[in-house]
């Protein structure tokens, strides 16, 4: 329930950053791998879980074919040259871990959530997924059909359609940020 006071929306909300708020602003350590790739590490001791993000400039704006970035990210977990998608899922499950991949506008992110004590066991698997993903054709075709059906269902929902077209109206349909998928893109 509100207090009955109507805020003045012409003014920004007042919020001061206090000294104790500054403690919540974590600053990453910057390291470099032997190949020169930067690593940004935020330590939060006391947590039993880690989150590892592998981030590459490989998002939607770089794709040459509609939905290529989206399906590439989705397929990362579906197998490698040496490990099937079922084996990957079983190994992650065994260690109480979760792996997600997403294609954003400017980047593709592979994220691992895992108990800290098993991180060392899972890093070789993550490296294998990133380096030798196999993109099985049968799994891709099944996923494309499923995603097309989901698209057709969502395309009848006003809120979803509005979100889809907002960027197109803002940037224009020719801009990478303004592109909107159509059903034929799933074929």
What are these regions (language model features)?
Residues 2-10, 89-187:
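Acidic/histidine-enriched segments that form metal/cofactor-coordinating
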